[in-house]
């Protein structure tokens, strides 16, 4: 998995099974209609395919690199739609989704300062409630009977943070002895979206378009994709680059 919304499903076939490609083809036809809004992709399962892909999850990898992420994202979406028209392509997707649900917390620094809190105080209290105190102040207890050290962490139970109201009720304390307050009195919470995965290549942000082939040779698909890429280069945002990697190059 590459993000919190991803999962791997491993399937082991019993002796005497049919060709694996047939199972993959049937699953591609059935999974999409039954699970709307979910993207499925089949990664190379055997070591030979993994080596031929140079460690990539798909034989086709089109990278769009550059610092203008929003422009690159729009370009990548347009390019993806064009490549989806190529016969024989499968599992086409953008590896870095931009629609991961986020909650944006905007702290009113004036209110926080008047109440005796700093931005660090609020961030630390949030981190303790959401991820546990082990992230900010690790604590250990040594069992004198067996000599083993155990980590001790405090964290707000999940059922107390299952709503925006629960998040707003997170207690905030400061190191300067300020009167404790709740998050809702010092900050506002807004629903937002953002990147679920941030990738870089040679320091620059990168967007990967991954794809596989189905019931067509990789060379034929690669030729069609190359024509689309050559035609799309004139639409590439200023300062960005587009590179093809993976088994498709061999």
PLM feature spans:
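Flexible hinge/switch segments at interdomain interfaces of large molecular machines
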Residues: 1-6, 41-59, 63, 93-100, ...
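Extracytoplasmic/periplasmic membrane-proximal domains and adjacent transmembrane bundles
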Residues: 73-250
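Short aromatic/hydrophobic contact patches that present stacked aromatics
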Residues: 8-10, 61-63, 104, 208-210
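Solvent-exposed, membrane-proximal periplasmic/extracellular interface segments of envelope transport
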Residues: 1-54, 110-136, 145-146
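Hydrophobic side chains in beta-strands
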Residues: 11, 42, 64, 154-156, ...
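Short, surface-exposed ligand-recognition loops at beta-strand->loop->(often short) alpha-helix junctions
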Residues: 17-18, 65-72
